Regions:
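Alpha-helical transmembrane segments of multipass membrane proteins
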Residues: 18-23, 48, 97-101, 123-127, ...
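Transmembrane helix-loop-helix hairpins at membrane boundaries of multipass inner-membrane proteins
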Residues: 1-6, 23-116, 190-202
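Alpha-helical multi-pass transmembrane bundles of energy-transducing inner-membrane proteins
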Residues: 27-29, 116-120, 124-209
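Small-residue faces within membrane-embedded alpha-helices
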Residues: 12, 36, 47, 93-96, ...
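Structural signature of hydrophobic alpha-helical transmembrane segments
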Residues: 2-13, 81-92, 134-147, 206-209
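Short glycine/serine/threonine-biased micro-segments
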Residues: 15-16, 34, 81-83, 91, ...
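Hydrophobic residues within membrane-embedded alpha-helical segments of Major Facilitator Superfamily
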Residues: 17-20, 39-42, 88, 94-95, ...
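Short hydrophobic "helix-edge" motifs at membrane interfaces and signal-peptide entry regions
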Residues: 3-5, 16, 71-73, 122-124, ...
Length: 209
């Protein structure tokens, strides 16, 4: 399978699967569980050709996919992986399977919504690890917080409301600061590519900020 198809499949298969589980609904909770398990296993299976096709002898990004996204902002749908992101992607896909299995009989209410949230979260996390465009990374990062917020707030423990509020405040503040930093780096480099950011001759003071 070509790398261009592979990374996008790893991202959008669990997201699409999550939406399908959501469409199944709680009226067919058993089907929702099985569909979630099948999608999580299929996503994990896609990691096999990714791992086999990865060349560990080079430090450059591999499985590159680069398409226009928001031309007005010089943002691209730019994906790729290196030796750091590869194991994180595999770990994410691997851990989703036991999460689905462990929740099989524990979650009895809003079953479809629960499994949909985890599958969508999986796809968005993989997107975070694949994104080579900072704005695309920011999109995946921010979108990832939505299913996390729902999982904590709906299926969390006794203090889930407090935990959700605290989670929101921390992530909102961090997201604002991250966005400011990305805009600053964009103004310095002229695009949102991670490689462009890495090549910037930033002063020590700028790096500390």
């Amino acid at each position: 399978m070509h790398g261009i198809d592979l990374l996008s499949l790893l991202i959008w298969l669990p997201i699409g699967g999550g939406l399908a589980v959501l469409a199944v609904g709680d009226a067919h909770a058993r089907l929702a569980r099985w569909l979630a398990l099948i999608v999580s296993l299929a996503t994990l299976a896609l990691c096999v050709p990714l791992w086999q096709g990865f060349d560990a002898t080079t430090a450059s990004f591999q499985f590159i996919q680069r398409l226009p996204w928001i031309p007005q902002l010089h943002a691209e749908y730019y994906l790729g992986i290196d030796g750091i992101s590869l194991p994180l992607i595999v770990l994410t896909a691997f851990m989703t399977v036991p999460v689905v299995i462990a929740s099989w009989s524990v979650i009895e209410k809003r079953v479809a919504q629960y499994f949909a949230a985890f599958l969508i979260l999986e796809g968005l996390m993989i997107g975070v690890f694949c994104a080579l465009d900072a704005l695309l990374f920011y999109f995946f990062w921010e979108a990832m917080l939505i299913p996390m917020f729902l999982i904590i707030g709906i299926w969390g423990g006794p203090r889930r409301v407090y935990a959700t509020l605290k989670f929101f405040l921390y992530t909102f503040l961090g997201s604002v600061l991250m966005l400011v930093a990305l805009i600053y780096l964009y103004l310095k480099s002229g695009d949102y590519t991670i490689a462009g950011f890495q090549s910037l001759p930033l002063t020590l003071q700028e790096q500390c900020w």
